[in-house]
Amino acid sequence: MLNRIHVIGSGRVGSAVAARLRERGVAVDGDDPELVLLCVPDSAIAEVAASVSPGPWVAHVSGATPLGALKPHARRFSVHPLQTFTRARGPEQLDGAWAAVTAETEAARDAGRSLAETLGLRPFDLADSARTLYHAGAVFASNYVVTLQRAASLLFESAGAPPEALEPLMRRTIENGFELTGPIARGDWDTVAAHRSAIQEHRAELDHLYETLAGATLALAT
């Protein structure tokens, strides 16, 4: 376990990480750190890493940024918490989430997995070359869900239905293990066609999105 970690960055991730480390008895404000952990925007990682004195481990928490951004440090790794963070909540946001650990040596891998476990995360190994594809998958699962919720809300608003009624439905879909239901799963193409007609009449800007998602759902259902 790393006992002295200097956390750089106090955004949503950095504040949660620092709070959890303090909970676990890790010194985050002292001198002579064993690890310098960069919790800064992706665009700032390379510049901040270059300013860190050599010696300790240097790591970042980005999902998309390769380890090369941590040059010139050879003792390096990354731990990406696969979670979405908000300032309204604290370190409990880390509990039980998975974490992608990317490392180039066994020692770095051990350090990364140790950090993840200290934070309350469930580590798995991820190749540096796979980071972009991995991050795209995470964006689908997190950011694009927000986009879909907004699209569904617009249709509810046009129908005179309360958008907040969608939230229990979305939660139950997750709780049910993403089991596919609905008209495409049933092969009810008349209903799908009726959806398209209604969307084209009231929210035409969402028709292409519906068509694309319907095609992807059909592939999933067959």
PLM features: what roles do these ranges have?
Residues P91-E175:
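Internal alpha-helical scaffold of NAD(P)-dependent oxidoreductase catalytic cores
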Residues M1-D32:
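NAD(P)+-binding Rossmann beta1-loop-alpha1 motif at the extreme N-terminus of oxidoreductases
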Residues L2-R4, G55, G96:
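Phosphate-coordination loops involved in phosphoryl transfer and adenosine-cofactor binding
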Residues I5-V7, L38, V101:
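Hydrophobic Val/Ile/Leu positions in short beta-strands of Rossmann-like dinucleotide-binding domains
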